[in-house]
Design a protein with these regions (language model features):
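A short catalytic or substrate-binding loop motif that flags glycine-/basic-rich loops and adjacent residues
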Residues: 1-2
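Short beta-strand scaffold segments in enzyme catalytic cores
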Residues: 5-9
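Short acidic-glycine loop/turn motifs at beta-strand connectors
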Residues: 10-14, 66-67
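Short, flexible N-terminal segments of the mature chain
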Residues: 14-47
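Low-complexity intrinsically disordered segments
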Residues: 36-135
Length: 135
């Protein structure tokens, strides 16, 4: 059981990876209040160098790039499945994250890995690798 999430902070062109076993379904609530609150929440976790979950186990993830002022994420039980609610949430999030480019990670953890320069294909479940190619 769990709602596994990968939490990443990019700063000074380096990536710090953190892990939370229980926050994927509520990740949206931790991000809502802006970058300071989000970064504080992420840094309360122990760093997990090189700890990437694959696309089967990762149920939510966030990457906050403090240098480029970008937020890339997916997760949150309601906004993941209710698209109209997600649209409203993202509009509200833009007000709380002034100056940041906010993006939904439509391909899950592989979008974050790709952004960070990590081998995103290694995070795909082997049974899926042969069936599709993410372009």
């Amino acid at each position: 059981m769990g709602q596994r999430a990968v939490l990443i902070i990019a700063e000074n062109e380096k990536y710090e990876i953190y892990y939370d076993h229980w926050c994927a379904n509520t990740l949206d609530s931790y991000l809502f209040w802006g970058p300071e609150e989000a970064v504080s929440f992420i840094r309360k976790h122990d760093p997990k160098k090189g700890y990437w979950l694959n696309d089967v186990w990762c149920e939510g993830a966030v990457l906050v790039d403090l240098d480029k002022k970008k937020l890339l994420f997916f997760g949150g039980e309601d906004i993941t499945y209710e698209i109209p609610l997600r649209r409203v949430y993202l509009e509200l999030l833009a007000e709380m994250w002034k100056g940041y480019e906010i993006k939904w990670a439509y391909h899950g953890i592989t979008d974050l890995a790709r952004y960070a320069g990590y081998d995103w294909k290694s995070l795909m479940d082997k049974s899926k690798r042969e069936e599709c190619e993410i372009i």
